[in-house]
A protein has these predicted regions:
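Short, low-complexity N-terminal intrinsically disordered segments enriched in polar/charged residues
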Residues: 1-18, 26-30
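Short solvent-exposed beta->alpha transition segments
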Residues: 25-62
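A mature extracytoplasmic/lumenal domain signature
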Residues: 28-31, 38-39, 67, 81-85, ...
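Acidic surface patches and DE-rich sequence motifs
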Residues: 29, 87-89, 107
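Surface-exposed, charged secondary-structure patches
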Residues: 50-94
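Short beta-strand edge/turn micro-motifs at domain boundaries
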Residues: 94-123
Length: 123
């Protein structure tokens, strides 16, 4: 399970680097709790990802530690992981580390989908 979770996180991080927004969007369920907002539609998530891509066209993300499983049931799992980032847009840049939290459920085809995402600054 740990290897599968690490592979999932790696694929999610790589999708966040892809200039094609659809790559990352495919990970999300049709409705998600999105950075504190409840029941956000996939269309709103897509608009947010487009804005983020426009604001930070050059970005790097990488896993910076272990994945911590917080809760697991038969069809769902909640976990957190440390994520480092470097963002750039011309002369503007930002970098740091966040603790990213994801909640996943198994979809109809047994593919895991994100139903909640959030993050907080890591110390």
């Amino acid at each position: 399970m740990v290897d599968a979770l690490r592979d999932y996180v790696a694929a999610f991080i790589l999708a966040g680097l892809d200039p094609h927004i659809g790559s990352e969007l495919e990970f999300f369920a049709p409705s998600v709790d999105y950075f504190g907002a409840r029941n956000v539609s996939r269309e709103k998530v897509e608009r947010d990802l487009v804005r983020y891509d426009e604001r930070w066209p050059v970005r790097r993300f990488w896993l910076d530690g272990g994945i911590i499983v917080q809760r697991r049931t038969g069809t769902s799992i909640e976990f957190v992981f440390p994520l480092r980032y470097e963002l750039r847009n011309g002369s503007k840049h930002a970098s740091g580390k966040v603790m990213k939290s994801l909640s996943l459920i198994a979809g109809g085809d047994n593919e895991m989908q994100i139903v909640a995402v959030n993050e907080s600054k890591a110390r």
